[in-house]
Structures are given as structure tokens and as C-alpha cells.
Amino acid sequence: MKIFSEQLVEEARVACHVADLATATIGEVLLVAQYLETKTGIPFIRMDQGSPGLPANHFGVEAEKAALERGVGSQYPPAAGVPELKEAASQFIKAFIDIDITPRACIPTTGSVAASFGAFIAATQRKTGQNRVLFIDPGFPIQKSQLRVLGIEWREFDIFPYRGQALRAKLEAELADGTIAAIVYSNPNNPAWICLEEEELHIIGQLATKYDAIVLEDLAYFCMDYRRDLGHPCQPPFVPTVARYTDNYVLMLSSSKIFSYAGQRMALACVSDALFDRQFPALAQRYHDTGVFGSTFIASILYMITSGCTASTQYGYAEMLRLAAEGKINFVEDTREYERRAHRMKRIFTAHGFHVVYNHDVTRPVGDGFFFTLGYPGMTGGELLKELLYYGVSSISLGTTGSQQQGIRACVSRMKPELYEVLDQRMRAFHEDHGDGREEERVKSERVKSEK
């Protein structure tokens, strides 16, 4: 039995100015869910927005307060970032990834969204004719929205059928015309929670070097592949990264998930030292500067977007990174609650006819973490998103992430202990209304009609 009527959901769609629920953005789904909650007082199971569901790390809070009390709020922050944060970032990267990036090339940004926005500009303007972006999907929809704002063309492909060595031929075909300036993916992946394995990262790195494309590696969910014993500073296993296989990279690290510091909008764009020092005549001509990638990226691009990052927050982030690198903060254990939530939620959904869409990496099953993907027999992703709204569950369609698979993205961050039973009841009702042969009959009926 539906909780929200079709009429009421349609009222919410119109009131929130959503063109089509099947292709609704994260923000649009959020507005519809909030409208229905406010209108009825009935709580939603919120699986839409990937906002942290844990308290902010208190070490960061205290360090930020101390910085404000020292008076840092009265001065503009350096465009390249405060030295304490740059040093801590370099130390953190060495401790957990085991690669060397000097502090000068670790650049604070106002969230990873600002990092990618600036990196898209720098990457696509550095060489004439090499001005497109390639997405290894599924991915974060906002990054393509950024390219729409910038007027940058892109190509994309769903990695689902191209895992392992199959990635090489596909990637080579996409890069062969020489127009791709940047390659983008997240690892672990938003939305699928798949993790690229070493052979895949090796392929990406080799081909990025061959075709001189810059890899933008989004590490927002750093060390959150809980299948591996990550998070021990200066001890293997280290975080997998393309940085072992190419010098053409920008690593995007965020405070939002690993330290639950999303409200302060703080991240890092960590550029390889080799790329940081490369000189590009096209950048020099456009910006009337030296054309050196790192300095142009900082002073001529990022500074024009945000004019630096909040000084006090930089000190808070620096403290969290420093303590983590010294082994005094175990941020992996702090975030492991997401693994427990995902495991429990998956059990509920799969007990009621759902299946996990992206369920395997190359050599093992996908783990439990911040996101997972769900499909239901006979339904497209857009149809499933819309149907779940009637049962008080909000999500986003995989179609909006560049996926070619049918299903939805589920985020676990807003799940609360008291809602598991509610979720179970609602999904039982959903399956009673859609499963047990009903969907098979509908598909069969539609097939017969089409044959006529």
C-alpha cells in the first residue's frame, strides 16, 4: 500500500518545479521529499543526498575555534593556502598513499566541487585542440553540470562492461583522437561503490601519459573500502591510486566524509610536482602569466573562483590531517558506521525483491559503504525512483550518473536506527504491490502488445 498518493507526489513535483521525476537531480528529489514530509508529517527514508551522517571531528572543531581566537579571521588567507595545511596534506598523502607530493603542490579548495571546477578549466585550456573531458562513469552528476556552466564538451562511458583488461581497449579508443584533456572518476565510486583495482589504475595511468591527459582522481571516500585494512599511517596496504603510474594527475581529497566536516567546505587539490612545474604556452597567452600549471591553477583560476579558502577552516583541516598521519585519529573506524548501515539496508532490500546492480569488482564482490545501487525487476531507474517516492523512500536514478544500467543510487548516511523497521515495512509493501509475478505479467503483457 502506497504511503503517498500519486496525486500528492504530482503536487509536490509541480510545487518544486521539477520537470520529470524520472530524471530529477539530487537537489530536486530532496525538495520533493521535504515537501511531502512537511505536508504530511510522515518521515522519508532519505537516500538522496550524500551528506555526512556522523558528528564533525571534534579535533577539527577545536583547532578551528583556536585559530579564530588567535585572530586569523581578520586577514585574507593566502591564495595557495596556509603553510600548516599544505605541510599536513603532504604528510597525510605520504602516510596513507605512500607517494610524495611537496607541500607547495597541495592546494586548499572550497570543497572538492571547487577543486574539480578549477581543474577542468586548467586542464582544458592548457593545450589548443585538447579541450574535452572523459568521464569513466557512473559518476558525480555535479561535475557534468560544471562543464555545462563552462561550455566544455565531454564524453563518457559506463565502466560496467569494461572492468579489468577490457578497460584498455575502451580507454584507448576514447583517447585516440587526441582531444581528451582530462579523465575523471571517483575511487571508491560514487554512486556504485565499485573500486578500481591496481591493473585498471595502471592502464589509466599509462594511457594518460601516452595521450597527455590529466587524471582527476576524486578520493572523497578516502580509505572507505572497508574490505581492506586501510588507514594505518606509513603501513601497507596503502590507498590505490593512479599516481603510481603517471605524473599527469590531480588528487582531490575532501574533509566532508572522512572527517564529517562537510559544512565547512574544505578540500585539497594535490597536483603531482611534475605537472605543477610544467609550462604551457596556451596558459601563458590566455592569462598573461608564466603559463606554469601550478601557479596558473592557483593564482589565475582558483583565486578567481573563491578568493582563497576560509582561514580558520584550513587550520581545522590541517589539525585533523596531521593527527591522522601521526596515528592519533582513526578516521577509518570513525566512518565504519556507514559499512554497518549499508549491510543492514541491503539485506532489507534484497529480502523484498531488489538486487544490487553494481555488485562486483574485478576479483571480488563490491563492499559495503557510503553508497550502493539497487534495481528491481522490470523497472527502469527512473520508474523505480518515482515508485519508491510513493512508499516514502527518496533516491536518485542511475541514469543521471552516466550509468547505462537500470536502477537507483542509495546513500546510507541519513539512516537512523529507528528507521530500519520502517524501511522493512515499506519495502515489504512495495514488493507485495509490485512483485510475486505481477511485474512479470506486466512485462509479458507489454511484450505481447508490441508484437501485435
Labelled PLM ranges:
Residues 2, 91, 95, 99-101, ...:
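PLP-dependent enzyme catalytic core of the Aspartate aminotransferase-like
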Residues 245-335:
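Conserved core segment of the aminotransferase class I/II
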Residues 2-9, 15-114, 165, 321-328, ...:
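N-terminal small-domain helix-loop-helix segment of the aminotransferase-like
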Residues 28, 84, 88, 300, ...:
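A non-catalytic, amphipathic alpha-helix used as a structural packing/dimerization or gating element
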Residues 311-314, 318, 331-346, 356-375:
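Conserved glycine-rich beta-strand-loop-beta hairpin in the small C-terminal domain of fold type I
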Residues 69-211, 216, 222-246, 250:
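Conserved core of the PLP fold type I
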Residues 270, 373-375, 411-413:
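Short hydrophobic/aromatic beta-strand micro-patches
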